[in-house]
UniProtKB/Swiss-Prot annotation:
GO BP annotations, alphabetical order: isopentenyl diphosphate biosynthetic process, methylerythritol 4-phosphate pathway
Single annotated GO MF: 2-C-methyl-D-erythritol 4-phosphate cytidylyltransferase activity
Pathway: Isoprenoid biosynthesis; isopentenyl diphosphate biosynthesis via DXP pathway; isopentenyl diphosphate from 1-deoxy-D-xylulose 5-phosphate: step 2/6
Domain of life: Bacteria
Pfam families per UniProt: IspD
Enzyme class: transferase
Residues with site note (Transition state stabilizer): 14, 21
Organism: Bacillus cereus (strain ATCC 10987 / NRS 248)
Xref: CDD domains: CDP-ME_synthetase (cd02516)
Keywords in alphabetical order: Isoprene biosynthesis, Nucleotidyltransferase, Transferase
Stored InterPro entries: IspD, IspD/TarI, IspD/TarI_cytidylyltransf_bact, ISPD_synthase_CS, Nucleotide-diphossugar_trans
Protein known as: 2-C-methyl-D-erythritol 4-phosphate cytidylyltransferase
């Protein structure tokens, strides 16, 4: 069993919507509801902890009334950074050995990816899902190409990311003591010298970040319904 942690206190400035992007609609249903539905079907998911902006609590609670989720959902105070929100959420876990940390704006994660991440976390203590980078990657400095990066070993990392509670807590405490801000939770685990297992993600598992992503998400949902 695991607890799902969703850091949901971000402002989503790149979306330019003037509100939390998780409230935006895909096929007339909020993004966050699509995401929660992906996990409520998973028997291994014990409960869900969402780290939110307290000012948005009424909106989240209203969503839960309108779109009930078949898992216990707890709202806690988010932090200034995503990393702070996850750390706060870890403090509220109980009676589980593992947590999965997932972006609320990734509504198309499959049960297979979820299970693969959990299995790898049980094996290694920490795990991520990722897909091969398809585009050519270049290092650029001051508007000029410095080098073309060999992409054969490069992966685009997604969520969920899975961890044993004790390991993730250790990694976050170490980062906090050193004022280190990572780009994801796995980077904190890497920083303390621990292994992170990697499983195959999905190109459908997009993060809805920009207006263009919303259009793509609508198309994905249309394909799924077919």
């Amino acid at each position: 069993m695991y607890t799902l942690i969703i850091p949901a206190a971000g402002q989503g400035k790149r979306m330019g919507a003037g509100k939390n992007k998780l409230f935006l609609l895909i096929n007339e249903v909020p993004i966050i509801v699509h995401t929660l539905r992906a996990f409520e079907k998973d028997k291994a998911c014990k409960n869900i902890i969402m780290a939110i902006n307290e000012e948005e609590r009424p909106y989240f609670e209203e969503l839960m009334q309108k779109y009930p989720v078949k898992k216990p959902v707890q709202f806690i105070q988010g932090g200034a950074e995503r990393q702070d929100s996850v750390y706060n959420a870890i403090q509220h876990t109980s009676d589980v050995e593992y947590v999965l940390v997932h972006d609320g704006a990734r509504p198309f994660v499959t049960n297979k990816v979820i299970q693969d991440v959990l299995t790898a976390a049980e094996k290694y203590g920490a795990s991520i899902c990722a897909v091969p980078v398809k585009d050519t990657v270049k290092k650029v400095e001051q508007g000029v190409v410095v080098e073309t990066v060999e992409r054969s070993q490069l992966k685009a990392v997604q969520t969920p990311q899975g961890f044993s509670v004790s390991l993730l807590l250790e990694a976050h405490r170490s980062a906090k003591q050193s004022c280190f801000l990572g780009t994801d939770d796995a980077s904190l685990v890497e920083r303390i010298g621990k292994q992170v297992g990697v499983v195959e993600g999905s190109y459908y598992n997009i993060k809805v970040t920009t207006p263009e992503d919303l259009l793509i998400a609508e198309s994905f949902l249309h394909v799924q319904k077919k």
